[in-house]
Regions:
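Amphipathic alpha-helical "coupling" segments that flank catalytic cores
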Residues: 1-426
Length: 426
């Protein structure tokens, strides 16, 4: 064990812990209330001889590190975070993507748009002001001495300096949370503003880097885009966000002026996110065929695991595989036609009306957020009865087209949950 001067406890806790834990591999010591104590513990790979000499050496090295931290902290505090931000004009974000200062300008627009989307138009002026301010200051700590020396403290020092500058706690916390999750399994943003800034930062990084043709291949991912994309996916899932991936990409494309590449960018990002979602589903133990069934549409990211869980529950239910067969039967016919408006006046058999009613009941249950399994089981029975009693390809062209349109409408609705043709049946 060893100790250091109490004066260093005036530094932000992470500024003391980081050089101690990450650089020297020492264990910090905390009081019962969680406050940091001026002491540390180390592990020696050897005997007990000369432990006092070893401890003294450890203390000397740590004091030098803490003295550096104190110096950088004092120098950094000679300017406000807003003043530090000006230096971002000289820091390149990425080749071809301008400066970090320009990035913060984009983040101001992106974060504000996300906050407005999350609030569904019920955002007050204070929340929007916080969104702009958090994004404006989000990268300012990157040019401070403390973060230059201890890069692990990015965002953390931004939070501390923002608080010392008198910024709102919401702004300060968001500056820290923008980098979450910092590693696999780490904490996700817990505040709405932190979520918004983090999502904005990640989608800006992904779209910007992709626009320069720097899409990760194989084991090469120099900009950590896979980790950021996975973080974005996990955030959207945890928040049960109704935010669409395509809307995020559109916002980023607007800010990068990528109009002619917009459609391609949507495809690239969706494919990239799809792979991250596949990883998430695999880790949750979702069957591989169920994964394929639900990953066709990943626009509403948070809904993908929900749909996967539903399909697995459907398969596990009594008659589940037969139900899937019924759904697949509809798709086998419907996907080769364009479909049109269904006219009940053209129904010739009562099974047609029964099928329409069963479909409407299932659609209504879904719209109301009810458990749709009972109504979809009823729909499956109606489908089987329909095919047993009705010849779809009627001699009357209008009747035939009406029946095909009915099947097309049902299949389109089922596809919103899953492509059941991907399911492997016993």
């Amino acid at each position: 064990s060893g100790s250091f001067e109490e004066k260093y406890l005036a530094l932000p806790a992470e500024a003391v812990i980081t050089p101690m834990r990450d650089h020297q591999r020492y264990f910090p010591v905390k009081a019962a209330d969680g406050s940091l104590l001026p002491a540390f513990i180390t592990v020696r790979n050897g005997g007990k001889a000369h432990l006092d000499v070893v401890a003294h050496g450890n203390e000397r090295v740590l004091r030098a590190r803490l003295a550096d931290a104190q110096f950088f902290f004092d120098e950094d505090r000679k300017k406000s975070l807003a003043e530090h931000r000006e230096k971002l004009k000289t820091v390149v974000f990425q080749r071809g993507l301008g400066s970090m200062y320009e990035k913060t300008e984009r983040l101001m627009a992106l974060t504000t748009a996300i906050v407005e989307e999350m609030a569904a138009g019920d955002t007050d002026d204070a929340a929007l002001a916080d969104a702009r301010r958090a994004a404006e200051l989000s990268k300012a700590d990157l040019v401070t001495g403390m973060v230059t020396e201890f890069t692990e403290l990015q965002g953390i020092m931004g939070r501390e300096y923002a608080l010392l500058d008198g910024e709102s706690p919401a702004v300060a916390r968001a500056i820290d949370e923008q980098y979450m999750p910092r590693f696999a399994g780490a904490e996700l943003p817990q505040t709405p503003l932190g979520f918004a800034l983090s999502a904005a930062d990640k989608i800006d990084n992904i779209v910007g880097t992709f626009s320069q043709g720097r899409i990760p291949t194989g084991s090469q991912d120099p900009f950590g885009l896979r980790r950021q994309a996975l973080g974005l996916v996990l955030m959207l899932i945890e928040q049960e966000s109704t935010m669409l991936l395509s809307d995020l990409v559109d916002e980023a494309c607007d800010l990068y002026d990528l109009e002619e590449f917009r459609d391609k960018m949507q495809v690239y990002v969706a494919d990239f996110i799809r792979l991250r979602l596949k990883n998430v589903l695999s880790e949750r133990g979702v069957r591989y065929d169920v994964q394929e069934a639900v990953l066709g549409d990943v626009d509403l990211v948070a809904d993908v695991p929900v749909r996967a869980a539903y399909v697995e529950r459907l398969l596990a239910s009594e008659g589940g595989e037969a139900l899937v067969q019924s759904f697949v039967r509809v798709g086998n016919i419907a996907r080769s036609v364009t479909g049109g408006t269904v006219d009940p006046a053209l129904f010739k058999a009562e099974e047609e009306g029964a099928l329409l009613s069963a479909y409407q009941a299932a659609a209504a249950a879904r719209a109301e957020g009810e458990d749709t399994l009972p109504t979809e089981q009823a729909l499956g029975r109606a489908i089987d009865t329909f095919f047993d009693a009705v010849m779809v390809m009627d001699k009357d062209a209008r009747v035939k087209e009406n029946r095909l349109s009915l099947l097309k409408m049902i299949d389109d609705d089922l596809l919103e949950t899953a492509d059941y043709s991907k399911i492997v049946l016993n």
